[in-house]
Amino acid sequence: MTRLLDAGATIIGKSTCEYFCFSGGSHTSAPAPVHNPWRMGYSAGGSSSGSAALVAAGEVDLAIGGDQGGSIRMPASYCGIVGMKPTHGLVPYTGVMPIELMIDHTGPMTASVSDNALMLEVLAGPDGLDPRQHAGRESQPYATLMKQGAAGLKIGIVKEGFGWPQSLAASDDKVRKAAQVLAGLGARLEEISVPMHLVGPAIWLPIAAEGATQQMMKDNGHGFNWKGLYVTSMVDFHAGWKARADELSETLKLTMVLGEYFIQHYRGHFYAKSQNLARQLRAAYDSVLAD
């Protein structure tokens, strides 16, 4: 917020999100379901449902969302706006309720790509308070770089990202057609293989379920030995859930039951293994991106 205000933005309010951000739909928020602005009664996606709906409806120019497993990208897709999940640590997460340090991302949601680039330029860069920013990536002139267009860009099409049993063939087709549009603008397409991409969801699950159960819920978002800024008001406010656990959403209850089962029966083994495998997966992506 501070960076946006310093850049001249006006803050008009807070958007509704899904209950504790644990839903990919738009039906679990505390006040009421968030309707898709293009058609009442249809999902706006989640968990940053309100942010996407407000931008799509033209109520705001810019909004901020959080993304641990699609929560910026899915509502952006459902509502027809541009949602950016930045590289981990590029945008400081300071002041946002943590879910799990390893997978916490926050980023811009806008009506256009140019607005998204400009907003990212304002938001990005170290703040000295967020331990996710250990690499210290600086902001870049994204809005200026965007004007160079797609000509000369080399785009890798990960073949393991297509043909999943649970994915829609129409969605796969849309992605490939979008790539061809970029090729028509001068980008170079290359099909690449990242075999470990196939186990990404299995790596993510213990980190999300066990990590969120422990860090977000039991430790009120921070816990002990936190290297970043403690937002004490957030810690105090969040702790109230323990006296009202019956009011938690069904999606969050399910996640906590799963996370607690793993913790009780496997003592963090699969969480630790997933963290180690995540490093290997990141290295696999970095390897192909280096080309």
Predicted features by range, described:
Residues 1-68, 151, 158, 177-180, ...:
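Gly/Ser-rich catalytic/binding loops embedded in alpha/beta enzyme cores
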Residues 24-25, 31-33, 52-158, 166-167, ...:
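Fold-level recognition of mixed alpha/beta catalytic cores in primary-metabolism enzymes, strongest
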